[in-house]
């Protein structure tokens, strides 16, 4: 049974990774990759991915749909909570003033946290409500593409 569960979870993780990278997000798997990405000039949207139901049913669809907008971040990146622990911990160091939360979204500008959309703003909400929250932040912090 343990072997079956591990295979099942590996499949879930693989699918979760594929969904977010297919949406145009770059996976960051090490602390060094996080530092390189999050210290770049411009705006960055970080999606903290997760295997929970609200990640698959709400956060990842919102991550995909939110960026189809006139104003959007310069780069889209993702870390995977519970999987890429070093990268996730390092990304959370940039989210000053916010407790760890997954799934979640962070908008950074020139390496500084501007806005978080935390799990409590995702779980129990419709994907389009999360899209609206993200696009509201894009209006405030991002340039027109």
From Swiss-Prot:
<feature type="active site" description="Nucleophile">
    <location>
        <position position="54"/>
    </location>
</feature>
<dbReference type="GO" id="GO:0006979">
    <property type="term" value="P:response to oxidative stress"/>
</dbReference>
<feature type="active site" description="Nucleophile">
    <location>
        <position position="52"/>
    </location>
</feature>
<dbReference type="GO" id="GO:0045454">
    <property type="term" value="P:cell redox homeostasis"/>
</dbReference>
<keyword id="KW-0676">Redox-active center</keyword>
<dbReference type="GO" id="GO:0016491">
    <property type="term" value="F:oxidoreductase activity"/>
</dbReference>
<comment type="similarity">
    <text>Belongs to the bacilliredoxin family.</text>
</comment>
<feature type="modified residue" description="S-bacillithiol cysteine disulfide">
    <location>
        <position position="52"/>
    </location>
</feature>
<comment type="function">
    <text>S-bacillithiolation is the formation of mixed disulfide bonds between protein thiols and the general thiol reductant bacillithiol (BSH) under oxidative stress. BSH is an equivalent of glutathione (GSH) in Firmicutes. This protein is a dithiol bacilliredoxin, which debacillithiolates (removes BSH) the S-bacillithiolated OhrR (OhrR-SSB) in vitro and in vivo NaOCl-generated S-bacillithiolated MetE (MetE-SSB). Involved in maintaining redox homeostasis in response to disulfide stress conditions.</text>
</comment>
<feature type="short sequence motif" description="CXC active site motif">
    <location>
        <begin position="52"/>
        <end position="54"/>
    </location>
</feature>
<feature type="disulfide bond" description="Redox-active">
    <location>
        <begin position="52"/>
        <end position="54"/>
    </location>
</feature>
<keyword id="KW-1015">Disulfide bond</keyword>
<dbReference type="InterPro" id="IPR009474">
    <property type="entry name" value="BrxB/BrxA"/>
</dbReference>
<keyword id="KW-0560">Oxidoreductase</keyword>
<dbReference type="Pfam" id="PF06491">
    <property type="entry name" value="Disulph_isomer"/>
</dbReference>
<protein>
    <recommendedName>
        <fullName>Bacilliredoxin BrxB</fullName>
    </recommendedName>
</protein>
<dbReference type="GO" id="GO:0033194">
    <property type="term" value="P:response to hydroperoxide"/>
</dbReference>
<comment type="subunit">
    <text>Interacts with BrxC.</text>
</comment>
């Amino acid at each position: 049974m343990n072997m079956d569960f591990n295979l099942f979870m590996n499949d879930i993780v693989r699918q979760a990774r594929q969904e977010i990278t297919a949406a145009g997000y770059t996976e960051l798997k090490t602390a060094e990759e996080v530092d390189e990405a999050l210290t770049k000039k411009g705006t960055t949207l970080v999606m903290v991915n997760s295997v929970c139901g609200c990640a698959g049913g709400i956060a990842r669809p919102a991550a995909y749909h939110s960026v189809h907008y006139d104003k959007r971040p310069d780069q889209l990146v993702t870390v995977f909570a519970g999987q890429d622990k070093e990268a996730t911990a390092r990304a959370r160091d940039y989210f000053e003033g916010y407790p760890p939360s997954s799934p979640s979204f962070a908008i950074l500008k020139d390496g500084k946290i501007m806005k978080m959309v935390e799990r409590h703003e995702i779980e129990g909400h419709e994907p389009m409500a999360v899209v609206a929250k993200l696009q509201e932040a894009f209006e405030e912090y991002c340039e027109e593409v």
